[in-house]
């Protein structure tokens, strides 16, 4: 498929041929869903924790005698049945990560790129070189281009001035091609890829 290439000042800069096997697939929600779940599960801290019976700070002394009180038989006040007692089978710190085949993850990335291309939310830039790393300059360019929530993917290395300018700009994320992932692509309304980024992604996913 053919895509128009523009510059940061919105002027045309020719066109580029995009690989249909990467940018021209029919997006499948089930594949995207599985990859996003894998990403978010891996990112989850898993630090949830509660105090169990052995963790609660109470005496282990039997609270009252076994027989003759008319009440139920109890031992320690740490039992889950009591207020401030330990929690029975509560959450403990653990990893939520699960495995997902490397080929499936690559397929998910292809479908994410294709979903932006098919909906017209993929823009190819010639490059993201800026003379100065000024946020005001980039903010003006982004406003004129009509970008609201945008992810910019560059080649192997991100232009230093562009990275500095975008760092303090709300709604603009910048990633190198190796950092391109399904979740970040779907999270933003517009996907912007430089020509160097397109070449790097096609080399990575072929």
From Swiss-Prot:
GO terms for molecular function: rRNA binding; structural constituent of ribosome. One of its GO terms (biological process) is translation. GO terms for cellular component: ribonucleoprotein complex; ribosome. It comes from the Bacteria. Keywords: Ribonucleoprotein, Ribosomal protein, RNA-binding, rRNA-binding. Gene3D superfamilies: 3.40.1370.10. One of the primary rRNA binding proteins, this protein initially binds near the 5'-end of the 23S rRNA. It is important during the early stages of 50S assembly. It makes multiple contacts with different domains of the 23S rRNA in the assembled 50S subunit and ribosome. Part of the 50S ribosomal subunit. Belongs to the universal ribosomal protein uL4 family. This is Large ribosomal subunit protein uL4. It comes from Cereibacter sphaeroides (strain ATCC 17023 / DSM 158 / JCM 6121 / CCUG 31486 / LMG 2827 / NBRC 12203 / NCIMB 8253 / ATH 2.4.1.). The gene is rplD.
């Amino acid at each position: 498929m053919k895509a128009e290439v523009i510059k940061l000042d919105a002027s045309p800069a020719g066109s580029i041929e995009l690989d249909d096997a990467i940018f021209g697939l029919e997006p499948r929600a089930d594949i995207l869903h599985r990859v996003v779940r894998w990403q978010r599960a891996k990112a989850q801290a898993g630090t949830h924790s509660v105090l169990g019976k052995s963790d609660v700070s109470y005496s282990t002394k039997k609270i009252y005698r076994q027989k003759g009180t008319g009440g139920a038989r109890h031992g320690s006040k740490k039992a889950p049945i009591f207020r401030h007692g330990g929690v029975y089978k509560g959450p403990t710190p653990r990893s939520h990560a699960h495995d997902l085949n490397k080929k499936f993850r690559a397929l998910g990335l292809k479908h994410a790129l294709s979903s932006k291309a098919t909906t017209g939310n993929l823009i190819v830039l010639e490059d993201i070189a800026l003379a100065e790393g000024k946020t005001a300059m980039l903010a003006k360019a982004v406003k004129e281009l009509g970008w609201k929530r945008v992810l910019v993917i560059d080649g192997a290395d991100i232009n230093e001035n562009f990275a500095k300018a975008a760092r303090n700009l709300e709604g603009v994320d910048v990633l190198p091609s190796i950092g391109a992932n399904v979740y970040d692509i779907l999270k933003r309304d517009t996907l912007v890829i430089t020509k160097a980024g397109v070449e790097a992604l096609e080399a990575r996913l072929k």
